[in-house]
Swiss-Prot record:
Gene this protein is translated from: pyrF
Role according to the record: Catalyzes the decarboxylation of orotidine 5'-monophosphate (OMP) to uridine 5'-monophosphate (UMP).
PROSITE patterns listed in its UniProt record: OMPDECASE
Enzyme class name: lyase
Protein name: Orotidine 5'-phosphate decarboxylase
The entry's keywords: Decarboxylase, Lyase, Pyrimidine biosynthesis
SUPFAM superfamilies in alphabetical order: Ribulose-phoshate binding barrel (SSF51366)
One GO term describing the cellular component: cytosol
Matching HAMAP family: OMPdecase_type1_B (MF_01200_B)
């Protein structure tokens, strides 16, 4: 699917960063037909949320399984092979060469798309230097993107700040997925490299991941609808 073929409604991925399956299912019910794509991360996955992937798929929803796998290639390959049976659309791995290579091997001929996480959106230059990286955020993101493209990764996860540069590097051959999205007036929380939905889409993002601004809202459906409307405006839809 080319970027032009992605409907505005399908570009919003709501992060179900909730404490239980019951809480997640209640949120899904409140959002109804407004949301077609959900993210399941550590918190929900380890609270019994993995079977929810298949249940959502049966309802025609898509699931982004955000597990950020990072291990030796063989272990990742075996894990990803098992994950292909869950019915998820996207799966994240960290953008290290052995990890990415193993994920592509484990995916095989399935429909699962592998996304490489470049640099977490909670990191800035100081955090990278403290962790021993000599490259800055932009340089490291671009280097990892180039490696991911060579290894056959389907898409990249980065902050919206790097999307424009990444689009120039990978063209439209890879999907660009951006967390760190905050509607105007929302608290940034623990995110350090953030952007509004419209600006992120204009910069070149294909999919936007939004969690707390939606799931912690008094009226989550209204917030999701507003974000999708902003996406549509940015696309000229």
């Amino acid at each position: 699917m080319t970027p032009a073929e992605i409907a505005p409604k399908d570009r919003l991925i709501v992060a179900l960063d909730l404490p239980s399956v019951d809480a997640a299912e209640a949120m899904i019910a409140r959002l109804g037909d407004s949301v077609t794509f959900y993210k399941i991360g550590y918190r929900l996955a380890y609270a019994g949320g993995l079977p929810l992937v298949a249940r959502l798929a049966d309802k025609g929803k898509k699931v982004f399984l955000d597990l950020k796998l990072h291990d030796i290639g063989n272990t990742v390959a075996q894990g990803v092979e098992s994950i292909t049976r869950l019915g998820a659309t996207f799966l994240t791995v960290h953008a290290y060469p052995q990890t990415m290579k193993g994920a592509v091997e484990g995916r095989g001929g399935s429909n699962l798309k592998i996304l490489a996480v470049t640099v977490l959106t909670s990191y800035n230059e100081d955090d990278l230097h403290a962790a021993g990286f000599r490259l800055g955020v932009a340089e490291l993101v671009e280097a990892r993107a180039q490696q991911a493209q060579v290894l056959g990764i389907d898409g990249l996860v980065s902050s919206p700040e790097e999307v424009g540069a990444l689009r120039k590097i990978v063209g439209h051959q890879m999907s660009l997925v951006t967390p760190g999205i905050r509607p105007a007036g929302s608290a940034s929380g623990d995110q350090k490299r953030i952007m509004t939905p419209g600006r992120a889409i204009t910069a070149g993002a294909d999919y936007l991941v939004v969690g707390r601004p939606v799931v912690e809202a008094a009226e989550p459906k209204a917030i999701a609808d507003a974000i999708q409307a902003e996406i549509g405006q940015a696309l000229g839809a």
